[in-house]
Amino acid sequence: MGELSFDAPVWHHGKALRKGYTTGSCATAAAKVAALMVLRQHLIHQVSIVTPSGVTLCLNVESPHIEGQQAIAAIRKDGGDDVDATHGMLIFARVTLNDSGEITLTGGEGIGTVTRKGIGLPLGSAAINRTPRHTIESAVREAIGPARGADVEIFAPEGEARAQKTYNSRLGILGGISIIGTTGIVTPMSEESWKRSLSLELEIKRASGLTRVILVPGNHGERFVREQMGVDTQAVVTMSNFVGYMIEEAVRLGFCQIVLVGHPGKLIKIAAGIFHTHSHIADARMETLVAHLALLGAPLELLTLVSDCDTTEAAMEHIEAYGFGHIYNHLARRICLRVMQMLRFTKTPPVCDAILFSFDNHILGSNRPVDEIAKELQC
């Protein structure tokens, strides 16, 4: 596995985490070394590249092979301490020299095919993103000089199987992995890359013609939408903990309606104005419940019981026992109010709705009738 030429760790919660490199860097290095091997007609076992972020990587070459005017080489993906579905797999490049003066880039076995608009690549093309396309072509051009041409094929024998553990199918990328990476470096625990992947799904939904979107924290929300609302899950996008970011992205893309659907354990934080719901950012679930129960006239005994709870589920049991289940409609309206306050400077803010459900998939509350919301989503 390749050695990184940079060794400054990323510190997260007091722990030093090792950086890695992207599939784009692997493909670039594999293409460069394959081109060099064709020209020099001898095997090369180590290659260096400069990533788009300016970091130099010195990577070990695996499975080098030369046959006439064609060479094949592979680089093993190393995500550092940010292990994902592609970690440890081999990314191959096959380079064939010709006299055309042009460099053509294609995707072979295990590289996904683009089947939907919205990710900035032509339909039917290989899922090799713009930055890796540029770095691959530049590396090969540097190796072969200005006059020669080359056919470059990127492939990954494990790609189709590995892709089943990624978001690719939801993004309309079928049959394999994507060759990605804007910096060439994988930063462990990087929220920005995670947020960008979620936003990309929003972009694809909008490009397909959808104008109304349902944002959910995770898979449970999608199941609720399908089973209890009877709405096509094509409209569902995961927001994870990045509530504010995904709402702003939905506004940027021009969605006219945003429906927040989730368990109170996540969504009640929004009622307190918390738009990043990870517990390391903020909690305040019990405080929020206590405050709104008090506004509804709940007795001190219930407020004390809820305040002493460690989980939302435990608090919900007390709320039900005291007959204050109507708090969930109240909280849903408060959530929508907070969202509209966040978007108060938006020229044409979208309609905002909120639906709260229990772990056993029952509707707890909403800002307006769920049937009404579902009907609009089906328009």
From Swiss-Prot:
Reactions performed catalytically: Co-precorrin-5B + S-adenosyl-L-methionine = Co-precorrin-6A + S-adenosyl-L-homocysteine
Transmembrane domains' residue ranges: none
HAMAP family, A to Z: CbiD
Organism: Salmonella agona (strain SL483)
InterPro entries in UniProt: CbiD (IPR002748), CbiD_sf (IPR036074)
Entry GO MF terms: cobalt-precorrin-5B C1-methyltransferase activity
Pathway the protein contributes to: Cofactor biosynthesis; adenosylcobalamin biosynthesis; cob(II)yrinate a,c-diamide from sirohydrochlorin (anaerobic route): step 6/10
GO terms of biological process kind: anaerobic cobalamin biosynthetic process; methylation
Protein name as catalogued: Cobalt-precorrin-5B C(1)-methyltransferase
PANTHER family with a match to the protein in the record: COBALT-PRECORRIN-5B C(1)-METHYLTRANSFERASE
